Curated annotation (Swiss-Prot):
SUPFAM superfamilies: Epsilon subunit of F1F0-ATP synthase N-terminal domain. This is ATP synthase epsilon chain. Pfam families: ATP-synt_DE_N. The keyword Membrane applies. Disulfide bonds: none annotated. Keywords: ATP synthesis, Cell inner membrane, Cell membrane, CF(1), Hydrogen ion transport, Ion transport, Membrane, Transport. Coiled coil: none annotated. Its main location: membrane. F-type ATPases have 2 components, CF(1) - the catalytic core - and CF(0) - the membrane proton channel. CF(1) has five subunits: alpha(3), beta(3), gamma(1), delta(1), epsilon(1). CF(0) has three main subunits: a, b and c. NCBIfam families: ATP_synt_epsi (TIGR01216), PRK13443.1 (NF009978). InterPro entries: ATP_synth_F1_dsu/esu, ATP_synth_F1_dsu/esu_N, ATPsynth_dsu/esu_N. Produces ATP from ADP in the presence of a proton gradient across the membrane. HAMAP family: ATP_synth_epsil_bac.
Length: 148
C-alpha cells in the first residue's frame, strides 16, 4: 500500500489544493471520517466544517468548506466544495458573508409555501453547521454585521 494518496479540493471559485497526502479528515454529513491510502471507494456528502489535510511529513493544513461532496478511492480523494477557503483566509468578513448566505437559504425555505418541513429543516441544519464551524475556528457567528 502506498504511503500517500492524491488530494484535490475544488470550489466554483478556484482550485484550492492538489497535493499528495497521508490522510484527509472530512466533515461528512453523517459524521466525520478519515480517508487514507487504500480506502474503500465511497461518495460522501459533506456538511459545513473543516477539512484537515495531513501531508507525508505529518504537517496539517485546514480548509473551511460550506458543504459539497467527496469522491474517495484507494489512491485519491477529490472534494468538490460549494465554497471553500484555506483556514488562514477565513476572516470575520468572509465568514459573515457565508453566514448571511446560509441565513438567506433558511428564509427562502421558510417563505416558500410549497416548501416541505424537510427543506426547512435542511436549511436550518446548514445554518447550525455554519455557526458551529465559525465557533470552532474562533469566528463569531453572531457578529453584528449580519443582514437579517
Amino acid at each position: 500500500m502506498a504511503d500517500t494518496m492524491q488530494f484535490d479540493l475544488v470550489s466554483p471559485e478556484r482550485n484550492l489544493v492538489s497535493v499528495p497526502v497521508r490522510e484527509v479528515r472530512l466533515p461528512g454529513a453523517d459524521g466525520d471520517l478519515t480517508a487514507m491510502p487504500g480506502h474503500a471507494p465511497a461518495i460522501v456528502n459533506l456538511r459545513p466544517g473543516l477539512v484537515t489535510v495531513v501531508a507525508g511529513d505529518g504537517s496539517e493544513t485546514e480548509f473551511a468548506v460550506t458543504g459539497g461532496f467527496a469522491e474517495i478511492n484507494n489512491e485519491s480523494v477529490t472534494l468538490l466544495a460549494e465554497r471553500g477557503h484555506p483556514r488562514a483566509e477565513m476572516t470575520q468578513e468572509v465568514f459573515n458573508e457565508m453566514m448571511a448566505q446560509a441565513r438567506r437559504r433558511v428564509e427562502a425555505a421558510k417563505e416558500r409555501e410549497s416548501a416541505g418541513e424537510e427543506l426547512v429543516a435542511a436549511a436550518v441544519k446548514l445554518l447550525a453547521d455554519m455557526e458551529a464551524l465559525g465557533t470552532h475556528i474562533g469566528l463569531d457567528p453572531n457578529h453584528a454585521n449580519f443582514p437579517h
